[in-house]
Amino acid sequence: VCGNVVIGENSFISKYNMNAWGYSDDNSSVVEHGVDIDFWKPDENIDRDNACLSVVNDWPNRDWCCGYNLWQQTVQGLPIKVFGKSPGLSEPASSTEHLREIYQSSRIFYNTSLHSPVPTVLLEAMACGCAIVSTANCMIPEIIENGKNGLISNDPQELRGFLQLLLKDEDLAKELGDNARKTIVEKYNLEKFVDNWNNLLHSTVNNYRNK
């Protein structure tokens, strides 16, 4: 089951998923995703393009979950960069290193996901210091505090306004990007992800042995 692993107790990738399945902290655990902060990191030697980056595979055919129509509606006339395997729209990065460079060279990362527990590209972009503009669906409000480490809304006009603001205000984009990186380092790093899983597995084994 997506977002749910049964190993003696219920484990979820976010509080959003846990609540959606009708569970609580009393009978479940949350193990949040993590990314490698030593790999996904800013490069101060790379200038950032003043454009809105999005990274999505098969985007037009996944409008229901990835918000392709919302993206079209909100970026009209704005400078954009799109990567991902979407024939007729965009090509994927040639390698993981290339994808990292794409994040590192982008001022703004724009995420329009409508139904996604944890968009991994969002975490990667945050780790690379991009200023985030995103919808406020599923787990995203657990990751992004609006105005502190990104800008989130489900209102198309407000999302477009956020993009326009960051295109004009490089200092604000830098501040939000730095705070986004800090969030990943402190809460969504790979080491913490592995440690949390190990602790959960050890706890489950010990509870089983004591029964």
Locate the predicted segments by residue.
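Short alpha-helical donor nucleotide-sugar binding micro-motif in glycosyltransferases
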Residues: 101-106
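A short, well-ordered alpha-helix in the C-terminal region of glycosyltransferases
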Residues: 165, 172-187, 193-199
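Short hydrophobic beta-strand element within catalytic cores of glycosyltransferases
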Residues: 131-134
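Conserved acidic donor-binding segment of nucleotide-sugar-dependent glycosyltransferases
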Residues: 146-157, 165-170
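A short alpha->beta transition loop at the rim of the catalytic pocket in nucleotide-sugar-dependent
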Residues: 107, 129
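Aromatic "clamp/platform" in nucleotide-sugar-dependent glycosyltransferases that forms part
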Residues: 114
